[in-house]
A protein has these predicted regions:
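N-terminal secretory/targeting leader peptides
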Residues: 26-126, 142-270
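Bacterial N-terminal signal peptides that target proteins for export
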Residues: 1-11
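Sec/Tat signal peptide C-region and signal peptidase I cleavage site
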Residues: 19-25
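Generic N-terminal leader/processing signal
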Residues: 4-5, 16, 29
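Signature of the catalytic double-stranded beta-helix
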Residues: 126-140
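Bacterial N-terminal signal peptides
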Residues: 10-19
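A structural signal for alpha-helix termini and helix-coil/disorder junctions
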Residues: 11, 61, 135-138, 145
Length: 270
């Protein structure tokens, strides 16, 4: 929810008539956030360390306005499966989320989970998906028409693999084993004859620690990084499921209408 305060700044005072010419400097408050935590999640970390400071810096340098940004990561305002709706309703002005948790509303955005070919290179995946977004503008338009938000940027995850509690050599050894996945990659679990268990990044560690599942399909930067899945599922194998450009950043359309054009331009460019 955007808030702003106007402050009159005298530009010139004419002694003859004591006339005051004034311009108005507005201070805008923006709520920015994600359901995932910042430190262990690359796309949220970029939001905190790149997007937010760049917006503040450029607005201060290039306009007469100021922005105050309230940052709400790790589900402080919206959980991973609630961020789309939070931006839609204006609870967040700008939000980042994985479309993989929105298969009911954004299934067309998840096409790269279902195509019979892929790439393990995230940059290649990102470039191809951007070309598709340009070729089929219906994908970004559905965000505006149905969910009151505009597409700003797309990020992604590196090549998915599988981490397990016990060591294994052949895929048939995973038959009947409970394996965690999320959203549209749940069908991958069945390829091993395993039992799919639905979870999300913030809850996967505890699910492994408490025995809810004995394996997890995840991208390596999460397995070996700040989420520390390697502590509970130390045996990691590269499967080649592919990298996925699945996380997007959007801005509430009502917020855009209330912001000055020069600030909107900066946000769109960042």
């Amino acid at each position: 929810m955007i808030r702003y305060l106007k402050k009159a700044i005298p530009i010139s005072i004419l002694a003859s008539g004591m006339m005051v010419s004034a311009s108005f400097a507005d201070t805008f408050t923006l709520r920015v956030g994600s359901g995932h935590p910042s430190k262990p999640t690359a796309y949220v970390g970029n939001m905190e360390k790149v997007l937010v400071p760049n917006i503040k810096k450029r607005v201060a340098a290039e306009t007469n306005h100021k922005v105050r940004i309230i940052e709400a990561y790790a589900g402080k305002i919206a959980k991973v499966h609630e961020t789309l709706e939070a931006v839609e309703k204006g609870l967040l002005d700008i939000g980042s989320y994985c479309v993989c948790f929105e298969t009911a509303k954004l299934l067309p955005w998840n096409f790269d989970y279902f195509v019979p070919f892929t790439t393990t290179n995230l940059v290649t995946n990102w470039e191809v998906k951007h070309k598709i977004l340009k070729q089929f503008p219906e994908l970004t338009k559905m965000l505006e028409d149905k969910y009151n938000q505009k597409f700003l940027a797309m990020q992604g995850f590196d090549d998915y693999g599988i981490g397990t509690v016990k060591q294994w050599q052949k895929a048939n050894e995973l038959k009947g084993v409970k394996v965690i996945a999320a959203g549209p990659n749940l069908p991958w679990v069945s390829l091993f004859g395993s039992i799919p268990v639905t979870s999300t990044l913030p809850t996967m560690y505890n699910d492994l620690a408490t025995g809810v599942a004995k394996g997890v399909i995840i991208f390596p930067s999460a397995h070996a990084g700040g989420f520390k899945f390697y502590e509970q599922a130390p045996y990691w194998k590269v499967i080649g499921f592919g990298a996925m450009a699945q996380t997007i950043t959007t801005i509430n359309l009502d917020t855009m209408k209330k912001l000055p054009p020069e600030i909107v331009k900066i946000i769109m460019e960042e």
